[in-house]
């Protein structure tokens, strides 16, 4: 059993230190940030360690030196000045109505007002900006120090009101007033740090903070949240070893599986690989490679917006776009890409300097598989019987019995019941759906696989077989099969050791489904020259 505990659901730095929990030391970044600028903003996905980082900043600025014993910052900080800290956590409620919004903000400010003996006249209860200003003034007057302001999940009110345009507009005005003293009282402020998931227009809330430093895409702060590989092996080695023993794997094999499932985030051009901290901690605690961060309830509006913009799994796993396309305000929801990036469904995988183009992809298997599952549920029109049927049919016929022929009627039945509203009647759409289904099932699947003789529409690899798919629209399955044979696609896999199966499928324009298919098992002996005696 591990000598330390995993901080499941714990986001308070002092509790982690005092409770002997596993902790990846981020204090060197805390010191660097504290001496960088005055106003800072950081966007990171949900459950990615933002609140813990804010809590660490709070402990540092409060001068609690004893909490940092043995950590990097202990050797860096010499003064340990204690500042008054105002911590505004906006994630502590749901902003589904004006009444809720007023109640939550009132409760947040009351906590700070009590610290400085401030009493509020009921008539001024909703004057949130004036109340924050009075807190700042009182903190400075009573301590003789500049104030540190930490704002966690600033965008929670916006996310909760996204489906009600009028409510969101009203809340935006309330929040603009709420935060207005930050600029007005700049002289009394030592440091401001604001976190959130989304990048809402700066003018919409922080209208006067024209010197706000955006840290989201900066290399030097790319690992302030999340866990790097070096941190994982340094601080969590004991847990990895236990997980390896539990699963009958080596240490390196376990590390590889953790990387495949939960690694792959990049928040800047030169960012090192970042593991999802929520998933890693839960996986190590359970000693299982399950899905933790990704929830199956991907917002329907996001998938519908993808449909409107003709975006599918094929697009999302290979996007080349400029930063202005994804690092942009999201409140209008006209483009799903910024939401997908800022929410953690997509991440930076590369950068082409000349064209200033970023390569966006899914970060890892957990997200890729989870997102495809959400899409398949959407394709199923949320009919769980259809969803369960396709999963069961694939598992039984392909994974267990290695029988693609037996699976094809089930795949056809899945297409037969597609709502017309989500069908783009073309070959690419049908290719995207098959790709999404296989991806959802966690399979090794590639589209447009390049060989010396052309590009294969789709290649599916299981433990037993390699399936080569050629898809046609308004033609015939025989024509699809002829292309596989004429271009000799199977040759590329002749030395793999698994069986190779050719699958030709034709889709009907009128039926909007699979019309016919042909399956042929390859004779791989044809590709091997007999040894001379």
Roles of regions detected by a PLM:
Residues 1-426:
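Phosphate-binding site recognition
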Residues 178-185, 338-346, 435-439, 443, ...:
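Metal-dependent nuclease catalytic cores in nucleic-acid-processing enzymes
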Residues 148, 465-467, 501:
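Structural motif
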Residues 434, 458-473, 487:
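Conserved catalytic cores of phosphodiester-cleaving nucleases, focusing on short active-site segments
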Residues 139-143, 437-463:
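Active-site metal-binding core of divalent-cation-utilizing nuclease and nuclease-like domains
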Residues 168-173, 473-490:
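Mg2+/Mn2+-dependent nuclease catalytic core
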Residues 492, 496-533:
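Domain-level recognition of nuclease-like catalytic cores that cleave nucleotide substrates
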Residues 413-446:
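Acidic-basic catalytic patches of nuclease active cores, encompassing PD-(D/E)XK
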